[in-house]
C-alpha cells in the first residue's frame, strides 16, 4: 500500500474536479456487475425454487364442490375486512357506518400534523403517534375478533 496524502482543498485542480461533481463517496461494491449478474439471479432462482417446492410438497387440495342452492348461515368476508364488516354490522345507521369507515384514513392522515417533531423517528419520542397506533391496533383487533362472533356477543367478545 502506498502512502496517501490528505487532499488539499486549496488545490485548483481538485477544486475544478469537485465543481464538476467528481469526488463523490464510492463506498461498497458497484451494482454492476456484482449485484445484477450474481446476486439478483440467485435470489430470483431461490424464490422460484421455494414456490415450486411448496407447490410440489404441499399442493392445495380441492374442496367439496360448490352448491349454489345451499347458502351458509352467516356469510363472512375475508379476514382483513373483519374490522370494517364489524363497524357496518353494529352501527344501525349505514351512512354513519360509511362515515366511520372514511374517518379512519382521515384520522391517520392528521396524525403527522398533530405532532410536529418529524425529525424524530424513535417511537418513544413521538408519544401522540405511538398512542394513536397502539389504540388503533387494539380497536382493529377488537373489531376483527368481534366480527367472527354472533352479533349479540360481538362488541363485548362474550367477556362482559
Curated annotation (Swiss-Prot):
Query: Where found, per UniProt?
Result: Plastid, Chloroplast thylakoid membrane
The cellular component terms of Gene Ontology attached to this UniProt record, alphabetical and capped at eight, are: chloroplast thylakoid membrane; plastid
User: Superkingdom of the source?
Assistant: Eukaryota
Protein topology in the membrane: Multi-pass membrane protein
GO molecular function terms attached to this record: electron transporter, transferring electrons within cytochrome b6/f complex of photosystem II activity; electron transporter, transferring electrons within the cyclic electron transport pathway of photosynthesis activity; oxidoreductase activity
PANTHER family linked to this entry: CYTOCHROME B
Q: How does it assemble?
A: The 4 large subunits of the cytochrome b6-f complex are cytochrome b6, subunit IV (17 kDa polypeptide, petD), cytochrome f and the Rieske protein, while the 4 small subunits are petG, petL, petM and petN. The complex functions as a dimer.
Sequence similarity: Belongs to the cytochrome b family. PetD subfamily.
Name of protein: Cytochrome b6-f complex subunit 4
Organism of origin is Oryza sativa subsp. japonica (Rice)
Q: Tell me what gene encodes this.
A: petD
Amino acid at each position: 500500500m502506498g502512502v496517501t496524502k490528505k487532499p488539499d482543498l486549496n488545490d485548483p485542480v481538485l477544486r475544478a474536479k469537485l465543481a464538476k461533481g467528481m469526488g463523490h463517496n464510492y463506498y461498497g461494491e458497484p451494482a454492476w456487475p456484482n449485484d445484477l449478474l450474481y446476486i439478483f439471479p440467485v435470489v430470483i432462482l431461490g424464490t422460484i425454487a421455494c414456490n415450486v417446492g411448496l407447490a410440489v410438497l404441499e399442493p392445495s387440495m380441492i374442496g367439496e364442490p360448490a352448491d349454489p342452492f345451499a347458502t351458509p348461515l352467516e356469510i363472512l368476508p375475508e379476514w382483513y375486512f373483519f374490522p370494517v364488516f364489524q363497524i357496518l354490522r353494529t352501527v344501525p345507521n349505514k351512512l354513519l357506518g360509511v362515515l366511520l369507515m372514511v374517518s379512519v384514513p382521515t384520522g391517520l392522515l392528521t396524525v403527522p400534523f398533530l405532532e410536529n417533531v418529524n425529525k424524530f423517528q424513535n417511537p418513544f419520542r413521538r408519544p401522540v403517534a405511538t398512542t394513536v397506533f397502539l389504540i388503533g391496533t387494539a380497536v382493529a383487533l377488537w373489531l376483527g375478533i368481534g366480527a367472527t362472533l354472533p352479533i349479540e356477543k360481538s362488541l363485548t367478545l362474550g367477556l362482559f
